[in-house]
C-alpha cells in the first residue's frame, strides 16, 4: 500500500470492468462448501499456499521470531508457545510492496506490552496477498482455512482454549479472520476487524465476508468507508458493534483539506493509506494509552450523531473502542460513532448542547454562524463552531455536538458568539432598502435564555442561564454569556 498506484489498483476494479461485472468477481464459493472451486476468476494459488505462523518473542522489529508448523509439537515448545495464555493472531491485508508495513511492528509491540504473557502470532500470507486485488480476494478463503487448521490443531493439545483467541485482521485480513472463525471447530473468542476491505465484499452473503457469526464477539472499526464514490473500507455493519470514527470517512490529519494538492503532487496514495490505516492506529492507541480511552456512542446514522442527539450511555449505548471494547451481543448490529484527534492519543471529549431559540419577529429561514466557548475548572475550550446539520428551528430546542481535545473539568460559564456583520450595520442596511421600497430581509435576531450541556464521557448534565434575563437577544457581531442556573444546575434532558 506504500506504492503510488495503490488507489489506482482499486480504481481498476471499477474502470477496467463493465458495469455490473464486479458482482461476478466476488469471493467464490460458500464457506461451508469446502470443495467448491472458484470459476471465472484468475486465481494464483499453489497446492500448498504460502502461509506461515510467526510467533513474535521480541519487541525488536528486526527479530525474525519463530515459525510454528502445524503438527510439530516439539517446535511449538521450542518457540515458547504458552498453551494457557491469551493468543493473538495478527492478519495483514493486501499488499502492493510484498513487505510488512510499519503498523504491524507497532501493533505487535503494543500487544506484548499490554499482555506480557500472551502469544502474539503474525499470520504471514504475503505471497498470496502480493497479487492483483481480485486474486488476493480469492486467496482470503484459503488463508482463512489455514488459520482455522492451526487453531484446530492447537485445540487438540487440551489446554488450549478458543475462548482465549483474538483474531485481529486489517483490510483483507479482517475477512481472512472471518473465514477462519467460520471454518474452525468451535467458536473463537473475539475477532477485531480493522477497516475491513470493501470492494468485492460489500453486500455479499455473510458466509463470504466477516460477520457476527464468526466469533463470540466481533468488533469493527470503519475509517475509510467513502471517498469519491469508491469505498475502500466496507460501509455496511459486519460485527456485533461497528464503530465509525469521524463518521467513518475523512479522518483528521489525513489531508482532506488538501485533496486536490494530493492529486497534483501524486501523494493521493499516502492520503488513502492514512485513512485506511487509521483503524490500526486507533487500536494501538487503545493498548498504549489506557488512561485515555476513547468512547463511541450508539446512533442510527452519522447525521444524528453530528446533531448531538446520540450521547447516551443508557442500556449499553456507549462503549470503549479498540482493545478495551466491552462485549456486546445483540440480535442487531450496533452502529457507533465518535470524534477523534488527528494523532495519538486520539481521545476527545464530547458535549451535547441543547439550545432553545425563539424570535419575536419573523426571522425567516435563518442560518446563524454561531460559536461557543466553554469555560471549565481545568481549562477553557477554543472558540468552537456549532455545526448546523439541518436548518435552525425557531421557537424550538436545537441540539448541537461540540468536542474538545483536552479535559475541561467542571463547566461554570459559556460564551455564545454570532459571527458576522454587527446588528447596527445590518439594521442600517435594512432601513436603506426600505427607503428604496425594496422588501426587507428577515430579522436576524434570536433570543436564547438557557443552554443545557451534557458531557458524553461523564454523562453529567448542567443548565446555564443567560447572565441578564432581560438581555437575552443576540444578532450578528454580538455575544451572550451564560452561567450555571441557580435553581436548575443539574437537569434531566
From Swiss-Prot:
Please provide the record's keywords in A-Z order: Disulfide bond, Glycoprotein, Heparin-binding, Hydrolase, Lipid degradation, Lipid metabolism, Secreted, Signal
Q: Where in the cell is it found?
A: Secreted
According to its UniProt entry, the protein's GO biological process terms are: cholesterol homeostasis; fatty acid biosynthetic process; high-density lipoprotein particle remodeling; phospholipid homeostasis; positive regulation of cholesterol transport; positive regulation of high-density lipoprotein particle clearance; regulation of lipoprotein metabolic process; response to nutrient
Q: What positions does the domain PLAT occupy?
A: 349-484
One GO MF term on file is: phospholipase A1 activity
Q: What is its EC number?
A: 3.1.1.3, 3.1.1.32
Q: Which cysteines are joined by disulfide bonds?
A: 66-79, 254-274, 299-318, 310-313, 465-485
By its UniProt entry, which SMART domains does this protein fall under? LH2 (SM00308)
Q: Which residues form the signal peptide?
A: 1-23
Q: Where does heparin bind?
A: 327-339
Sites carrying sugar chains: 67, 82, 395
Q: How does it assemble?
A: Head to tail Homodimer.
Q: Which family does it belong to?
A: Belongs to the AB hydrolase superfamily. Lipase family.
Q: What does this protein do?
A: Exerts both phospholipase and triglyceride lipase activities. More active as a phospholipase than a triglyceride lipase. Hydrolyzes triglycerides, both with short-chain fatty acyl groups (tributyrin) and long-chain fatty acyl groups (triolein) with similar levels of activity toward both types of substrates. Hydrolyzes high density lipoproteins (HDL) more efficiently than other lipoproteins.
Other remarks in the entry: It is termed endothelial lipase due to the fact that it is synthesized in endothelial cells, a characteristic that distinguishes it from other members of the family. However, this protein is also expressed in other cell types.
This chain belongs to the protein called Endothelial lipase
Gene that this sequence comes from: Lipg
Amino acid at each position: 500500500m506504500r506504492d503510488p498506484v495503490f488507489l489506482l489498483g482499486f480504481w481498476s476494479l471499477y474502470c477496467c470492468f463493465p458495469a455490473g461485472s464486479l458482482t461476478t468477481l466476488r469471493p467464490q464459493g460458500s464457506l461451508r462448501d469446502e470443495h467448491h472451486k472458484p470459476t471465472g476468476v484468475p486465481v494464483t494459488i499453489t497446492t500448498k499456499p504460502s502461509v506461515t505462523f510467526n510467533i513474535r518473542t521480541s519487541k525488536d522489529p528486526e527479530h525474525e521470531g519463530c515459525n510454528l508448523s502445524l503438527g510439530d509439537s516439539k517446535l511449538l515448545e521450542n518457540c515458547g508457545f504458552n498453551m494457557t495464555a491469551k493468543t493473538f493472531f495478527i492478519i495483514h491485508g493486501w499488499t502492493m510492496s510484498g513487505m510488512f508495513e510499519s503498523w504491524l511492528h507497532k501493533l505487535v509491540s503494543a500487544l506484548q506490552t499490554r499482555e506480557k504473557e500472551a502469544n502474539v502470532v503474525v499470520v504471514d500470507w504475503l505471497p498470496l496477498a502480493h497479487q492483483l486485488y481480485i486474486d488476493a480476494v480469492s486467496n482470503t478463503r484459503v488463508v482463512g482455512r489455514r488459520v482455522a487448521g492451526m487453531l484446530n490443531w492447537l485445540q487438540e493439545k487440551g489446554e488450549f482454549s478458543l475462548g482465549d483467541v483474538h483474531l485481529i485482521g486489517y483490510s483483507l485480513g479482517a475477512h481472512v479472520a472471518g473465514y477462519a472463525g467460520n471454518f474452525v471447530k468451535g467458536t473463537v473468542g473475539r475477532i477485531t476487524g480493522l477497516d475491513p476491505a470493501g470492494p468485492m465484499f460489500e453486500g455479499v452473503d455473510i458466509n463470504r465476508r466477516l460477520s457476527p457469526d464468526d466469533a463470540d464477539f466481533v468488533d469493527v472499526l470503519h475509517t475509510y468507508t467513502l471517498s469519491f464514490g469508491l469505498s475502500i473500507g466496507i460501509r455496511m455493519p459486519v460485527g456485533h458493534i461497528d464503530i465509525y470514527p469521524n463518521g467513518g470517512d475523512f479522518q483528521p490529519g489525513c489531508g482532506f483539506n488538501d485533496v486536490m494538492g494530493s492529486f497534483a503532487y501524486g501523494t493521493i496514495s499516502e492520503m488513502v493509506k492514512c485513512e485506511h490505516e487509521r483503524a490500526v492506529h486507533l487500536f494501538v492507541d487503545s493498548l498504549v494509552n489506557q488512561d485515555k480511552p476513547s468512547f463511541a456512542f450508539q446512533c442510527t446514522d452519522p447525521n444524528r450523531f453530528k446533531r448531538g442527539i446520540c450521547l447516551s450511555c443508557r442500556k449499553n449505548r456507549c462503549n470503549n473502542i479498540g482493545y478495551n471494547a466491552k462485549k456486546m451481543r445483540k440480535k442487531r448490529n450496533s452502529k457507533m460513532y465518535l470524534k477523534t484527534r488527528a494523532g495519538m492519543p486520539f481521545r476527545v471529549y464530547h458535549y451535547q448542547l441543547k439550545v432553545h431559540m425563539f424570535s419575536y419577529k419573523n426571522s425567516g429561514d435563518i442560518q446563524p454562524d454561531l460559536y461557543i466557548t466553554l469555560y471549565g475548572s481545568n481549562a477553557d475550550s477554543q472558540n468552537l463552531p456549532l455545526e448546523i446539520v439541518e436548518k435552525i428551528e425557531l421557537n424550538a430546542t436545537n441540539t448541537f455536538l461540540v468536542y474538545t481535545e483536552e479535559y475541561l473539568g467542571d463547566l461554570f460559564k459559556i460564551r455564545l458568539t454570532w459571527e458576522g456583520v454587527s446588528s447596527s450595520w445590518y439594521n442600517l442596511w435594512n432601513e436603506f432598502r426600505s427607503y428604496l421600497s425594496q422588501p426587507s430581509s428577515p430579522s436576524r435576531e434570536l433570543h436564547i435564555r438557557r443552554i443545557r450541556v451534557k458531557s458524553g464521557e461523564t454523562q453529567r448534565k448542567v443548565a446555564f442561564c443567560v447572565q441578564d434575563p432581560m438581555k437575552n437577544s443576540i444578532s450578528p457581531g454580538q455575544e451572550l454569556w451564560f452561567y450555571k442556573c441557580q435553581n436548575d444546575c443539574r437537569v434531566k434532558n
